[in-house]
Amino acid sequence: TCLVNNLPAQAGTKNNTTSNIVASSNWNRQSVMDIARRVADWQIKDYPENKYAKSEPRGWIAGALYMGMFDWAELSGDNTYYDWLRKIFNRQNWQVANRMYHADDVCIAQTYIDFYNKEKNENMLKPTIARADWVLNNPSNGSMDLDYSKGSTIERWTWCDALFMAPGVYTRLYTLTGNRKYMHFADSEFRATYNHLYDKDEDLFYRDSRYIGQKEANDKKIFWGRGNGWVIGGLAEILKTLPADDKEFRPFYLDLFKEMSERLAWLQGKDGYWHASLLDPDSYPSPETSATGFIVYGLAYGINQGYLPANKYLPVVKKGWEALIRAVETDGKLGWVQPVGADPKKVTRDMTELYGTGAFLMAASEIYQLAEK
């Protein structure tokens, strides 16, 4: 296994003597607060016009935004952002989305539980517990081979994005209630996905079983940037929300987190971004800020917790943060976000989406702790 601080130039972490030095004006807490506020405020202003906010306010696309917005509300201490979230959630009656088993449809519950932990209002929690208990009592035996023509195959976590959407619901419920049934279920399902989609030679996840054996133009395997961003972000959420003293489940997730972190650090582009295709960036040379945001979030969280050595990973995180900042327009719109999809696609600067902002705000909340006071 490579050591991150001995990476070759093409990995983009040591391509010249200045590449690792973030403009000092950006690497301080006030700057992090300012840019995060600008991004959050632009998104709130644009939210009513967003097609997914209109059609699926309880869906995963908005759900990933809510997670970042909650982190930002905590960081800023500004009740405006809590109020914005609470208003949306009250309108939804704190319900999860409709598909009983679908991981995407419980992503929002992670923020519901965080809100409950803050305000202790049981109405925030009841629908989530009802859904989780139903799934536990009626486990799906669908195949792990994703096939959209067979509904039972999306009842399991058969695509790697699901590892961000659902496990953090169950880790939170386990920590909140002390009931091990939630963690036994989540651990069993996560490991089924890991066994099916994780490539132990590459230390990366296939998006789903359809991509196993497929090749990019350069004859490398297809590993999607945002897909692996979802996983590293999801692992950070699992580690963050498991009980601190847990010794039964944590070791597996921590080992996987470290293994993937090392591989992802190696794959950062010279420009500081991770690209839509992790192993064929030449075919997809444009920045991709949803992958970059989730990966920066994961790595920064790892440094803050002492899981990843700062001397190796801080240069990677600084470079990634600088890249994210370059993608923000003066009005706060985050660009270069790959649209909804399942595999590498071309991205342009004008593309944005709710989960891209969510990833940016999650990253900002960890970067703030790393930045100079």
Predicted regions: what is each one?
Residues 2-5, 239, 368:
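Residue-level signal for alpha-helical transmembrane segments in multi-pass membrane proteins
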